[in-house]
Amino acid sequence: MLTNDEILARVRETEAIRHGHFALTSGRHSDTYIQCARVLESPDVTAALAQEAVRRLDVEVDIVASPAVGGMLFGFAVALALHKRFVFTERVDGAMQLRRSFEIPRGARVLVVEDVVTTGGSVAEVVALVEAAGAEVVGVVALIDRKTERKF
């Protein structure tokens, strides 16, 4: 099991943490930015972080679902660590929907995985899709949680 300090060290080894002034896609501003793509370009670090996320789960999962594009790589890594099916959502004409041909069965236990959560908007949209399919969201995992007000 990795400690929080060990997790931070693994992220730092990818040189993903930046300091300065950043305008985030949420419209907010920050003096620190974590470029998740730098973390995700390292298969070893991504796998270690996904395995740690799985170790910390205390729920049964049938399917992992992530929003495209950001959450897809980490979501797949978590699904691989769980040995579970992976699906993703994508935005079409401004609306979030399941990728063509993906299905979430009624009653499935779904773990939603995202790379970075700032406002929670994308996660809330994925949660709504899962629930509309008659499935249950059993948890949300994020590689980076900016600890702001949630919508889910």
Segments from the language model and where they lie:
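PRPP/pyrophosphate-binding module of the type I phosphoribosyltransferase fold
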Residues: 91-152
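Active-site-facing substrate-recognition patch
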Residues: 1-59
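Gly/Ser/Thr-rich beta-alpha loop segments that engage phosphate groups in nucleotides
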Residues: 22, 29, 72-73, 122-123
